[in-house]
């Protein structure tokens, strides 16, 4: 009976204490998806060139670019 309790204690102790103290690494696909999602959110927040912001006679470039300062029309 004492052996049973000893095994039970070792099992519970190793699962709770050791499992709580040793952090498992984040799987690479999940980490990669999180980084891609952050990049997409950053791009969505950028202010791309919009035709209605351009002064008369100037237009946005054909390739969409993010405007840091001003409407960036050419």
From Swiss-Prot:
Keyword Signal among UniProt keywords: yes
Keyword Protease: no
Family named by the database record: Belongs to the scoloptoxin-07 family.
The species this protein was found in: Scolopendra mutilans (Chinese red-headed centipede)
Role noted for this protein: Toxin that inhibits voltage-gated potassium channel currents in DRG neurons (IC(50)=about 570 nM). In vivo, induces neurotoxicity shown by twitching, paralysis, and body contraction. In vivo, insects injected with this toxin showed signs of neurotoxicity including twitching, paralysis, and body contraction.
Annotated signal sequence range: 1-19
Propeptide: 20-41
Keyword tags: Cleavage on pair of basic residues, Disulfide bond, Ion channel impairing toxin, Neurotoxin, Potassium channel impairing toxin, Secreted, Signal, Toxin, Voltage-gated potassium channel impairing toxin
Lineage, broadest ranks: Eukaryota, Metazoa, Ecdysozoa, Arthropoda, Myriapoda
UniProt-recorded Gene Ontology molecular function terms: potassium channel regulator activity; toxin activity
PTM note: Contains 3 disulfide bonds.
Tissue distribution: Expressed by the venom gland.
Protein name per Swiss-Prot or TrEMBL: Kappa-scoloptoxin(07)-Ssm2a
